[in-house]
Amino acid sequence: MAPGRTGAGAAVRARLALALALASILSGPPAAACPTKCTCSAASVDCHGLGLRAVPRGIPRNAERLDLDRNNITRITKMDFTGLKNLRVLHLEDNQVSVIERGAFQDLKQLERLRLNKNKLQVLPELLFQSTPKLTRLDLSENQIQGIPRKAFRGVTGVKNLQLDNNHISCIEDGAFRALRDLEILTLNNNNISRILVTSFNHMPKIRTLRLHSNHLYCDCHLAWLSDWLRQRRTIGQFTLCMAPVHLRGFSVADVQKKEYVCPGPHSEAPACNANSLSCPSACSCSNNIVDCRGKGLTEIPANLPEGIVEIRLEQNSIKSIPAGAFIQYKKLKRIDISKNQISDIAPDAFQGLKSLTSLVLYGNKITEIPKGLFDGLVSLQLLLLNANKINCLRVNTFQDLQNLNLLSLYDNKLQTISKGLFAPLQSIQTLHLAQNPFVCDCHLKWLADYLQDNPIETSGARCSSPRRLANKRISQIKSKKFRCSGSEDYRNRFSSECFMDLVCPEKCRCEGTIVDCSNQKLSRIPSHLPEYTTDLRLNDNDIAVLEATGIFKKLPNLRKINLSNNRIKEVREGAFDGAAGVQELMLTGNQLETMHGRMFRGLSGLKTLMLRSNLISCVNNDTFAGLSSVRLLSLYDNRITTISPGAFTTLVSLSTINLLSNPFNCNCHMAWLGRWLRKRRIVSGNPRCQKPFFLKEIPIQDVAIQDFTCEGNEENSCQLSPRCPEQCTCVETVVRCSNRGLHTLPKGMPKDVTELYLEGNHLTAVPKELSTFRQLTLIDLSNNSISMLTNHTFSNMSHLSTLILSYNRLRCIPVHAFNGLRSLRVLTLHGNDISSVPEGSFNDLTSLSHLALGINPLHCDCSLRWLSEWIKAGYKEPGIARCSSPESMADRLLLTTPTHRFQCKGPVDINIVAKCNACLSSPCKNNGTCSQDPVEQYRCTCPYSYKGKDCTVPINTCVQNPCQHGGTCHLSESHRDGFSCSCPLGFEGQRCEINPDDCEDNDCENSATCVDGINNYACVCPPNYTGELCDEVIDYCVPEMNLCQHEAKCISLDKGFRCECVPGYSGKLCETDNDDCVAHKCRHGAQCVDAVNGYTCICPQGFSGLFCEHPPPMVLLQTSPCDQYECQNGAQCIVVQQEPTCRCPPGFAGPRCEKLITVNFVGKDSYVELASAKVRPQANISLQVATDKDNGILLYKGDNDPLALELYQGHVRLVYDSLSSPPTTVYSVETVNDGQFHSVELVMLNQTLNLVVDKGAPKSLGKLQKQPAVGINSPLYLGGIPTSTGLSALRQGADRPLGGFHGCIHEVRINNELQDFKALPPQSLGVSPGCKSCTVCRHGLCRSVEKDSVVCECHPGWTGPLCDQEAQDPCLGHSCSHGTCVATGNSYVCKCAEGYEGPLCDQKNDSANACSAFKCHHGQCHISDRGEPYCLCQPGFSGNHCEQENPCLGEIVREAIRRQKDYASCATASKVPIMVCRGGCGSQCCQPIRSKRRKYVFQCTDGSSFVEEVERHLECGCRECS
């Protein structure tokens, strides 16, 4: 037997043994350990918030609770929860789950609670929960579910709480809830439900909570049952509103009368819906059982497609794999097209169960191997296209079930041989394509030549690639004897039937036996396909710079030697040598390696010789050679090693020779260990020598004494490896995330092999130039930065870049060569910038681009942008979002749909648009400055002499700015630091004349006078008794010409002035005041007091006498009035009533002596009255009477922790209580109080309730509050207004909150039945006056204030005159209405005519009254016009003179606010939204929306909150099947 054959047989046996070992491991008992990163406690497993993308493996079988919320899980498979038979609680909320495979919960028999809310589910598979009979709570809210199929909840008969709110549900199939007999809570709010079948809730006897609000309910005859059903159950289904038809929009379903629920035309049963028809993926289109997802950028096979599909088209996407059972549920599928994707991995059972499949198209992918059994069971398959892949092997039984196959294409693959018998099962084959494969025409392919000669079905012209003697010859034309085998060919191909075949010699290489010599070929990377038999691989003298981790050595089990010498290798990636356990010799001599780490040699466990000579290595770390326990020879000769970390060679247990010569070793304290190691180990080393310090130079390291290895100062070990991830970022494999870090530049330490780089949300102003050095990048996210400009060739080195995100920056201009070199780019996002133009040719290199985002840019759509519109239309690379902003004729038009001929140039372009790509065109540099473009600042100005600043607007001639103060003169001077000098006027000094010298430093003021500095002088302020310029003259105030004392007072001179001695009866400093001695007079009996000098005189009334009129006349006691000794206050008059004195109070006052002010009139703008807080208790009764003719104002206000206000609002009384711990509550009076009359208002606070009573009517209550209102404890009570300094700060203000004061009268304010006294009125400026005089003038009418002290009267009917005190006559007395009724209008009247008459006096006969009897309206009602002519008012959907024409299906735009119910608050959009209402006839079909889109709107709620929600807007109406 040949040696080669023996070796191959051993390899096969080794693989079989390995497979058996793996099978035994996999079949063993599962580990009970906790999944990685998760936390396990008892029977609970917590994996929440770990960023997981899939359900982790290894979940303990005894788990009862599993938390997987707040991760990034996208798919739930059938295997994820296998064996978890004890699980009771499962949390999957807040993930990205879009697919749940059927049977995913089949083992969860004990499951009680399942949360799947806040995911991306669009389809709810039928029978998903049939194996969870104990489920009681199921939360599916906040997903994207579109329909509820009939069998969705089969099996969960015990569920009590089902939450389906905040989805996109528009269809609920009949019987969907039939199994839910124990259901108590059902939430369906915030969906798109328009119809609900009458049987939907019949089987829910225990239902106590039902939420249906915020849907699109169409209230026609089919929904009448729901109105009755809700009226019988008033506590559930609250806020359920009609949204159509238009005349019922906004009405509560329960409140609409049954007669209003009508259907147009004949009707019987409600139209049924099909939930499966709604399960079309959002990126695809579905019609006629065909799903079309072509060119949608999909990365995986869409799940939950309509079950009845017969064809799916997935070509031209980015799908990389086909998972197990991807199409198993689509039993009717006949055609699958997944061509032109990136598929490299296909599960063996990907097409399982597709017995009806006739066509399978897989061409244009990256398939290298067909898994065993992939096509098994496809008995109906007729067309199979596998061309344009990378298939290098086909097992002999690959096509064993394809008896009906007609056409098979294997064109353009990597097949070198085909096993005999591969095509034997193909009994119906008619066409076979095998060309463009590198066939090795040896003895193993002889059968194919015979087969093709007998069956001439190969039509593509398959040819031999090797050996050379048969190269390029057609296989079908070569004679059988030409197919011969050499030794290597036999070794290579004999196991081809099981895909153990080997490859031919790589291009540019030479193969001799098992030696593959690829040296000196200028290769930049290791060839991707090498023969399996290779033992010696020679790659020396090439241009390889980086050794990638491609896994190439895993395919070379026989490899023993690798020569990579004399390349340009700078980096060896981790895992580059994985699978090279059999390699014994590795040559890396003569490269450019600078650093080494243990991961770079991973996989070389059998290595014996390692040559690293002549590199740039500077240090050797203690993990550099980890795992190389078999190395015997290590050469580090001729490097730049200065230090070696202790223990660097410890793992080299087999080492016998090490070459460390020609290295600049620094023999400091860190190298002491090496001397000891060399002396201790008997090893050949060549005696490496020290180069530093100087006194140890050229001394062998092993000869240096231990005390001579010293460190001076801070000599750190230089072998500390730099981190592979910047400290501001996080790195996972080759993905680097530096988002929202406030970065201004690219962080240092970026891994060279980074493939995805996220830099969004930083402060970058330009694309970092360093990015061009990272050539492996496939994705760059630079969104939400401040990048304002791109430069040409910015990304030209990034040949692998497929996604570039530049959205939400400040980009103003796109240079024509900005994207040159990006031939692999598929996604370019320029969304949300300031781009107005894109030069033609900018996208010439973007040959792979499939998606371009240009939305939210102010595009200027003239002729220069015509090319872009054509380019977009040609490839549909822009999804129809980008709109034109200018010129005006193109505003708001889509680039995708606007006809090309509309892109025209008319007149000059706005300079602000042109300047975006050349800011200098807008002449930003002033004062003759020179402008030049700048990539960051947009432009830069070079200023002329004497100007500076960004725009050259700051003058350097500082005299222009008048720097000299106080009138100083400026002179330019180069010798001064500031370039100028000042000539100061007298009295000032300093560089800018800013200093006024103190002239008081040397003054002549006398007698302790005060000196006051002036400008170049000073003044003396004299003390008392002194005068003169210098205060040197004495003053005598008592000389006659200076005596100031009055009324003959005596002047007395003092040292510091004078004083006056007053005569009796006078006072004051100068005796200027005549004292009023009547202030405390003793005159009696109403005598008049007359003041005199130092006394007073009493003038007695008639009959009285005495000094104080104390003697009455004779008989006076019999004539004394009771009022004589009774004093009335505030100008009241005393009268005698029943022999008792009584005060007749003026308006506004009350009390026995009119001492209390109980009525005040508020006439000022900011008037108010303040009552002390002590007057109000937490439980209080406040009452008052109000008279006003104003609509709004503040009656009462109390501001503290729980603000309370009693307001006049639109003529009604409004009570507002605004607790800071809960939403504000409001109640309004039914009565109006703005008629000028007095109305009683009462506020009662008791037992956590607030009640409002107006005019003794029915109380209005705010209901039970959370706590007792804390009114009146810490702050005052304001009536009629508030101080301007206070404001309504404590109350949450709204658009309807009146901030103005009250204008009118407030009378009899009582707090806890105690009448309040307003005596302590504010100052008159506040506009509060006693009484309410203006309201008592008009006898039979209402007072209206026209000025501060003036009123006019508005009389009641039947009264007239200025004061409404004259009785008016009835104007209808003696009226002249002939055939009608007289109606009085003030002082006149009008005639209301009877039917058949007209005219001012109803004296003209009208013959048009019966005109409608002969005028027929088919679909409307007849009316008479102002001219007496009949006309038809048509029903919606009809037109014509007689409403006989049915309108075509058209959309009518209605602008109105969209309403939502959020908990107990009513919410509406901030502005009116255009809504399209479809009206018109469609015959047997229905007029319905056929095109719509979703837009985001802001909703504002009555509780003060707001939120943003996507709302579906209809764009086009048409006829379609009724649903």
Curated annotation (Swiss-Prot):
Ranges of the LRR repeats in the UniProt entry: 62-83, 86-107, 110-131, 134-155, 158-179, 182-203, 308-329, 332-353, 356-377, 380-401, 404-425, 533-554, 558-579, 582-603, 606-627, 630-651, 753-774, 776-797, 800-821, 824-845
Disulfide bond residue pairs: C284-C293, C441-C464, C443-C485, C505-C511, C509-C518, C667-C690, C669-C711, C920-C931, C925-C941, C943-C952, C959-C970, C964-C982, C984-C993, C1000-C1011, C1005-C1020, C1022-C1031, C1038-C1051, C1045-C1060, C1062-C1071, C1078-C1089, C1083-C1098, C1100-C1109, C1123-C1134, C1128-C1143, C1145-C1154, C1305-C1332, C1355-C1364, C1372-C1382, C1377-C1391, C1393-C1402, C1412-C1422, C1417-C1432, C1434-C1443, C1449-C1487, C1467-C1501, C1478-C1517, C1482-C1519
Sites where a glycan is attached: N72, N192, N563, N622, N784, N792, N797, N928, N1025, N1181, N1247, N1406
Localization terms from the record: Secreted
CDD domains: EGF_CA, LamG
Pfam families: EGF, Laminin_G_2, LRR_8, LRRCT, LRRNT
Entry keyword annotation includes Glycoprotein: yes
Keywords (A to Z) from UniProt: Developmental protein, Differentiation, Disulfide bond, EGF-like domain, Glycoprotein, Leucine-rich repeat, Neurogenesis, Repeat, Secreted, Signal
Gene3D superfamilies assigned to the protein according to its UniProt record, in alphabetical order: 2.60.120.200, Laminin, Ribonuclease Inhibitor
Domain named LRRNT: residues: 34-61, 271-307, 496-532, 716-752
Chain ranges of the EGF-like domain: 918-953, 955-994, 996-1032, 1034-1072, 1074-1110, 1119-1155, 1340-1365, 1368-1403, 1408-1444
Alphabetized GO MF terms: calcium ion binding; heparin binding; Roundabout binding
One GO location term (cellular component): extracellular space
GO biological process: animal organ morphogenesis; aortic valve morphogenesis; apoptotic process involved in luteolysis; atrioventricular valve morphogenesis; axon extension involved in axon guidance; axon guidance; cellular response to hormone stimulus; negative chemotaxis
Signal peptide (UniProt feature, chain positions): 1-33
Primary residence: secreted
Annotated ranges, domain Laminin G-like: 1158-1332
Domain LRRCT: residue ranges: 215-265, 437-487, 663-713, 857-907
CTCK domain boundaries: 1449-1523
Function in brief: May act as molecular guidance cue in cellular migration, and function may be mediated by interaction with roundabout homolog receptors.
Name by which UniProt lists this protein: Slit homolog 3 protein
